[in-house]
Amino acid sequence: MEESSVTIGTIDVSYLPNSSEYSLGRCKHTNEDWVDCGFKPTFFRSATLKWKESLMSRKRPFVGRCCYSCTPQSWERFFNPSIPSLGLRNVIYINETHTRHRGWLARRLSYILFVQERDVHKGMFATSITDNVLNSSRVQEAIAEVAAELNPDGSAQQQSKAIQKVKRKARKILQEMVATVSPGMIRLTGWVLLKLFNSFFWNIQIHKGQLEMVKAATETNLPLLFLPVHRSHIDYLLLTFILFCHNIKAPYIASGNNLNIPIFSTLIHKLGGFFIRRRLDETPDGRKDILYRALLHGHIVELLRQQQFLEIFLEGTRSRSGKTSCARAGLLSVVVDTLSSNTIPDILVIPVGISYDRIIEGHYNGEQLGKPKKNESLWSVARGVIRMLRKNYGYVRVDFAQPFSLKEYLEGQSQKPVSAPLSLEQALLPAILPSRPDAAAAEHEDMSSNESRNAADEAFRRRLIANLAEHILFTASKSCAIMSTHIVACLLLYRHRQGIHLSTLVEDFFVMKEEVLARDFDLGFSGNSEDVVMHAIQLLGNCVTITHTSRKDEFFITPSTTVPSVFELNFYSNGVLHVFIMEAIIACSIYAVQNKRGSGGSAGGLGNLISQEQLVRKAASLCYLLSNEGTISLPCQTFYQVCQETVGKFIQYGILTVAEQDDQEDVSPGLAEQQWNKKLPEPLNWRSDEEDEDSDFGEEQRDCYLKVSQAKEHQQFITFLQRLLGPLLEAYSSAAIFVHTFRGPVPESEYLQKLHRYLLTRTERNVAVYAESATYCLVKNAVKMFKDIGVFKETKQKRASVLELSTTFLPQGSRQKLLEYILSFVVL
């Protein structure tokens, strides 16, 4: 058998079937709608698959609807039944039909004519921001306070000089912070971006119905708050460009001061970007910089008061893992405070999902391998632009979620009878150390006691803002389209890690595409599956190896096993993780429950029977364990409720079946009568068939028992789901092993480096099952989780965080139980 192996980065196009026709996406669609390119099917495309694709392809779901439970009025607002049918369009496809002119010259100058006809003028944007902020009462108070600290015992004249000095400092800070939007620069940048985006993106897709909702929101004369996920530096320009193309004024963008570099900073200022410190506490003694905080607060308030649009990245920084990170709600709290003070009547919030076939940064392998982040510079920006012009990054999809009223959300939350949420320590320690009381089980028992709601109450305010941020990020993440590179990378890592024939990969790609659509997530691609798969393989570059087998005239696709390549594949694979995250949690929990029952010897003759109550509890505890990996569910739902719903889906799929009555009666009495420390909340209990409808619902209720299907396709799906969480659980379990050798106190940064080195060593020695378990993001998340559940105590010494073991986990036995708890979910 003759074989030749090449990486796709240097692939010989003669190896590709119908290479002359392999041009997926390179055509700029002449239709506004997203239509299939009419590619000729390649040889590995079977007639059966063609028939299945035409017959089974699902209608695209409309994503981004706001939460009906929290904002029922906004649910009906801006939306009508015709919006989902408006379809998609390619924003960067512009010709004379998008202008008022026709003819040969209009075709040649279509970009110039298009940007010239956009509605953007100086009157749209804020004026006199610096003076208004300096004259605000909060800033004046901060200036006086800082001046008093400079001259605590000074005379009136010295105090006046100190105030003038602080005012000059405040004005200088504002001059660096405040954006001066230039309509001319926006037009020029729009023209440049049309040229650039067409050179390194094949298209940028938006849903026309979503833009109609955004346009309707702009007509309310209320400030809009755009809150996108953060994947790439190009995010800053992308949103402004799309809004500009649709005659919607540019938002003011909160940018980190790491981008405050010569020339580039001027461009960002002219486009509406304003720079903020990445850390607000930058005084030499580590105290809060009250002057800077007051100026930033005043700046945001003034923009909102003048009905400007804002764009804030809740994650704070670009995601290095490919997953949506946890929220940092600092600036969002300023927005909430502004609304609470009745400065403005309302704010419309718009979560935004952004998906890339391939980010312009390519990957974050350097940082994931523990290398320090390189500071941005003018030279690095120039090199980045040159690099982008030499490559193509495929498709981009931007989804605008339905705008919702922030006022409605806040008022609704203030009236809900919700008790204070459990800390991770309260929720998880009883599961790790069973001798402790089970606080998680009593989570809902206090829900009937309605707390007094007062936005001035700091604890309630913090909880309210945190929940709002989680709500927004969950919606934005749910709105993110799944790209072809996400699915292909996921299949190669967690279904076919040893390699797979291209024809089989295409079949599995089609099946997974249908699974994604069935879960109401949209796709960022269209067309024949074999062409889309080849498109994804090309973009994944050196991460994938293609071997040509001349005997079968077939290709064999293998993921690269080098650590950087696996890290990169994992980054793109994580783009699809949120689609299956809850199902993966249930799959791992099924294993944990079965493994515990099998090793404990109490299963008796139960076979595959498992307790539904126990499964839901186990899954909920795993949700808590993984809560630092992103927003798993809406904050208006408990983990118990979400796990219960997901178990119901497994029953619908046929993966789990409710045991027959005779089988449930055969359950050993010791197991059937097992008492839990606390009852589950009402939605998670199951009535006995014999229980009288008028009986007290608080009495002990009968559990329900489930069977796990042994069908081959169901077992394969469970295995796939378990592998999705494999890297996370391996990282956490390895971190738990490393805790056994802890010698403290130790600076957190030093401990992170040691733990990361340990995980990388496991990978280099082929001890690790998943090489991607050694990413630096997982190291940080594992240590943060251990701090949250009380494994480590954290103290501050000279502005540095120092870790030491808590008294609870000083005994080796407690650390061993932590390890055993995490390992219970790990499928060996």
Swiss-Prot record:
SMART domains: PlsC. The modification N6-acetyllysine is found at K780, K784. It is a peripheral membrane protein. Residues 88-118 dip into the membrane without crossing it. Transmembrane segments: none annotated. The keyword Transferase applies. A motif (HXXXXD motif) lies at residues 230-235. This is Glycerol-3-phosphate acyltransferase 1, mitochondrial. It comes from Rattus norvegicus. The lineage of its organism: Eukaryota, Metazoa, Chordata, Craniata, Vertebrata. The gene is Gpam.
